[in-house]
Amino acid sequence: MVAEDATVGGGRIAVTPPPSRTADRDRAGRIRESYGRWARIYDWFARATASVGGVRSSCVDALGLAPGDTVVEFGCGPGANLPVLREAVGPGGRVVGVDITGPMLRRARGLVARRGWENVSLARGDATWPPVAAADGVLATFVTSLFPDAYDVVGRWCDRADRVVVANFVPRGHRAANAALWGFARVNARLFDAAQGDVLAQLAARTDASRDALDARMDTVETTRHVFGTIEINAGLRES
């Protein structure tokens, strides 16, 4: 897949295409197909649940962004997090949203156009091989569960920024939430590589792997849990 350059405030942020590997192409195709099909519904759901459990605000707070910073969101989807990220960096900062799914990006671009944001850009690219060279902060919400190599992916994100915040579902401890998550993963078995075996155990393993990557690459990692413990936010910080 070829990544597209992102334009912000008259300048260009260099983006590079990921290595061409059959496994990566197959995974990317599954993600594009699944999320592209449900883009409109996902857009509504993401905005309707923006404030549930304080997850979104907690993620942004954990990034510790300052006015003028550059923040990249991998798996930005229809742009539900863009408003709070832009507010955090101010008009002098930059927000870059990266997603692999065209219909999602079209909805995000519509949001940016309606708001008239000149310092928010969007790039189509694969988050597993980050198409952005550097930033002050990186955010990814409910993304790493899609990656069989979540440890390596998050490690590459840590190469791009000194602050990396990852939010994931934690399929343990709450029966109703686990049942809903199990059902969603089963319906989208190809998306989660979950055609066989214990899908909840697989999701838990990928959440653990993303946290382990932060532990290995960052100086400190803070973990908080939300919504009856079903959502985990891990914030990695590299001391300057």
Language-model regions, residue ranges each:
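Core SAM-dependent methyltransferase catalytic element
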Residues: D219-S240
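A short SAM/SAH-binding and catalytic strip from SAM-dependent methyltransferases
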Residues: G137-A150
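Conserved class I S-adenosyl-L-methionine
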Residues: D5, G9-G64, A80-V84, R107, ...
